[in-house]
């Protein structure tokens, strides 16, 4: 009997509803082609939820997500809500509580330079010509952002501020397994990023990662210091497959990976817990300046759906079909404004239609 899956859809603010509508088209195409039983429910989140319910994350939204197999998230925030106290603003009041509530400890950020988009890569042309396809696996719940003690004390010239980098063995083990399992489905290479020549937390990180690697003899492991990694990403990103990073180092490298692709409109993101439940979202923001103009690139949102199908639902064939459809659209010259340069640009809705069509046709 075919299992029925349920997705909680949270469009959010800005371009969120527009690009989410395109992901919904592609989901319909996947259902049609593969006979999948996937239902969806739409819930308010972010600024839209503040306007309707007085809270960026209403209880009904959380309850709906609890009943789902995964969350497909749009984007939140905008100048309309910047006057609110920081904790009540859409970004901090919605996304962070969702991550905490569902214990999402791992963040996966693919960064790929698609064929035909080399001119948008800021790297030297000979480097861009080699292409790259990187998955940045970042630990989300430990490290210096959450370690205690932290604070400020003293006055005048003796005032000081401090943060604490703390990692437990279990935190490193579980994120390392995510990286190695992901590498098995890719090119079987993991590069673990640390600062083991200086930091005790990085020494433990390296020891634990080496131990986990013994369970994956088919995956090649290398270690790289964070300062060298930032340089190597610019020098030759094609050398990397899966980057395994702590919270701080992953924050830095995932944004660097994003920048060298040439467009934030192409970058999805997945945040997972130990049960495989995930929140999937574009890596970019809500872009309120272009909302409602039919010019936003929906591919990041569509690729977020691809990650959802792959990691939470285990539907690799459907995920592969969407990725092939996106490749086909780009290879045939279809571009939204962020990728068109001086050439012809199509709209948000048109790009969604084309990708959905290619999914159904099975290109």
UniProtKB/Swiss-Prot annotation:
Name of one Pfam family that matches: Iso_dh
Subcellular location per UniProt equals: Cytoplasm
The top EC class, named as a word, is: oxidoreductase
Query: Which residues does the annotation say bind substrate?
Result: 99, 109, 138, 227
Residues the UniProt record annotates as site (Important for catalysis):
145, 195
Co-factor binding details? Binds 1 Mg(2+) or Mn(2+) ion per subunit.
- PROSITE patterns registered for this protein in UniProt: IDH_IMDH
Q: Which GO terms describe its cellular component?
A: cytosol
- Please write the reaction equations for the catalytic activity of this protein: (2R,3S)-3-isopropylmalate + NAD(+) = 4-methyl-2-oxopentanoate + CO2 + NADH
Self-association and partners? Homodimer.
Stated family = Belongs to the isocitrate and isopropylmalate dehydrogenases family. LeuB type 1 subfamily.
Task: Indicate what this protein is called per its UniProt record.
Answer: 3-isopropylmalate dehydrogenase
Q: What's the source species for this entry?
A: Yersinia pestis
């Amino acid at each position: 009997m075919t299992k029925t899956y349920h997705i909680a859809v949270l469009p959010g603010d800005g371009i969120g509803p527009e690009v989410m509508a395109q992901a919904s088209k592609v989901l319909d195409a996947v259902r049609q082609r593969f006979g999948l039983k996937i239902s969806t429910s739409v819930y308010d989140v972010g600024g839209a939820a503040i306007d309707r319910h007085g809270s960026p994350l209403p209880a009904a939204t959380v309850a709906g997500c609890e009943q789902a197999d995964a969350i497909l998230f749009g984007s939140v925030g905008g100048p309309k809500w910047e006057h609110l106290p920081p904790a009540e603003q859409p970004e901090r009041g919605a996304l962070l509580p969702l991550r905490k509530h569902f214990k999402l400890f791992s963040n996966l950020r693919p960064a790929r330079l698609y064929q035909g988009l080399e001119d948008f890569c800021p790297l030297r042309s000979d480097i861009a010509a080699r292409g790259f396809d990187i998955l940045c696996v970042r630990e989300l719940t430990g490290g210096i952002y959450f370690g205690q003690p932290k604070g400020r004390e003293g006055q005048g010239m003796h005032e000081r501020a401090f943060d604490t980098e703390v990692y437990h063995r279990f935190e490193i083990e579980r994120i390392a397994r995510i990286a190695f399992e992901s590498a098995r489905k890719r090119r079987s290479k993991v590069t673990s990023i640390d600062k083991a020549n200086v930091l005790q937390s990085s020494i433990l990180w390296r020891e634990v990662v080496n131990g986990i690697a013994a369970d994956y003899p088919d995956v090649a492991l290398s270690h790289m210091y964070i300062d060298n990694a930032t340089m190597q990403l610019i020098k030759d990103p094609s050398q990397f497959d899966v980057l395994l990073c702590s919270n701080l180092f992953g924050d830095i490298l995932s944004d660097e990976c994003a920048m060298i692709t040439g467009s934030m409109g192409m970058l999805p993101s997945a945040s997972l817990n130990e049960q495989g439940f995930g929140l999937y979202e574009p890596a970019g923001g809500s872009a309120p300046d272009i909302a409602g103009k039919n010019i936003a690139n929906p591919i990041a949102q569509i690729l977020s759906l691809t990650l959802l199908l792959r990691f939470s639902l285990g539907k690799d064939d459907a995920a592969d079909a969407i990725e092939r459809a996106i490749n086909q659209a780009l290879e045939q010259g279809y571009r939204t404004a962020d990728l068109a340069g001086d050439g012809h640009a199509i709209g948000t809705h048109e790009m969604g239609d084309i990708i959905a069509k290619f999914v159904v046709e099975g290109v």
